[in-house]
């Protein structure tokens, strides 16, 4: 299943996990894979001693800082980064969501590959579908040449879907197929293609609330 990272503002991430409805904006809590604390602490120490160019990318400077809260947050991103699985990041407005996704990418084994961000809040359903999955030549009137899919451009790298709760049900269900089987088809094509890209999604609405409001498919949480 998806690993979920929740961003909150406060300091401590110790103690039992809270429900999404109990959470304040900004602190980092990790749900999902096992926590390899000693290994993570070692990785954090290595990162702190590395030159900035070794791990920084555009936007990731917002996660630079020596505070205990920020160090704890980065270490939890490292915990997620070492598990090469789909990841959902949630936080309120003002939290560094896209920089967190970029940090996740450069902290993973995919750091040398492409990071392809898509803003799901922009454009109509058809435009978003074309940006994510691309289209073949003659897929529709005026499609005189094929357009590559973001998922193809992110091959072996990371595809970021920002504001996924704004994507239509049609788009989200195609993403379910992608996450479940690694399969996808460009618009206008019946040929199945396969992807090895890691998908990272950002939600600005609490996941459970988004599911209950019909804005986020529960099936995506299961992939």
Residues covered by each model-derived region:
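Short beta-strand-to-loop transition segments that serve as allosteric relay/switch motifs
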Residues: 6-12, 204-205
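Conserved ASCE P-loop NTPase core motifs with emphasis on AAA+ ATPases
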Residues: 9-64, 68, 75, 223
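AAA+ ATPase active-site-proximal loops
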Residues: 48-211
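A short helix-turn-beta junction within AAA+ P-loop NTPase domains corresponding to the substrate/partner-engaging
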Residues: 214-223
């Amino acid at each position: 299943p998806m690993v979920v990272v929740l961003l909150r503002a406060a300091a401590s991430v110790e103690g039992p996990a809270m429900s999404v409805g109990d959470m304040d904006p900004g602190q980092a809590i990790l749900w999902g894979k096992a926590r390899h604390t000693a290994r993570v602490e070692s990785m954090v120490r290595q990162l702190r001693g590395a030159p900035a160019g070794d791990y920084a990318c555009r936007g990731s400077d917002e996660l630079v800082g020596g505070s205990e809260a920020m160090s704890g947050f980065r270490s939890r991103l490292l915990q997620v980064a070492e598990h090469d699985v789909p990841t959902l990041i949630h936080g309120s407005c003002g939290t560094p969501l896209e920089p967190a996704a970029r940090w996740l990418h450069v902290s993973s084994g995919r750091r040398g590959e492409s990071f392809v961000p898509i803003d799901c809040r922009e454009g109509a359903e058809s435009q978003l579908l074309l940006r994510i999955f691309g289209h073949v030549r003659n897929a529709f009137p005026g499609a005189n040449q094929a357009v590559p899919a973001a998922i193809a451009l992110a091959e072996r790298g990371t595809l970021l879907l920002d504001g996924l709760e704004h994507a239509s049900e049609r788009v989200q269900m195609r993403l379910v197929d992608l996450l479940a089987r690694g399969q996808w088809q460009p618009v206008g094509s019946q040929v199945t293609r396969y992807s090895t890209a890691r998908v990272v999604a950002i939600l600005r609405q609490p996941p459970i609330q988004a599911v209950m409001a019909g804005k986020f498919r529960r099936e995506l949480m299961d992939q």
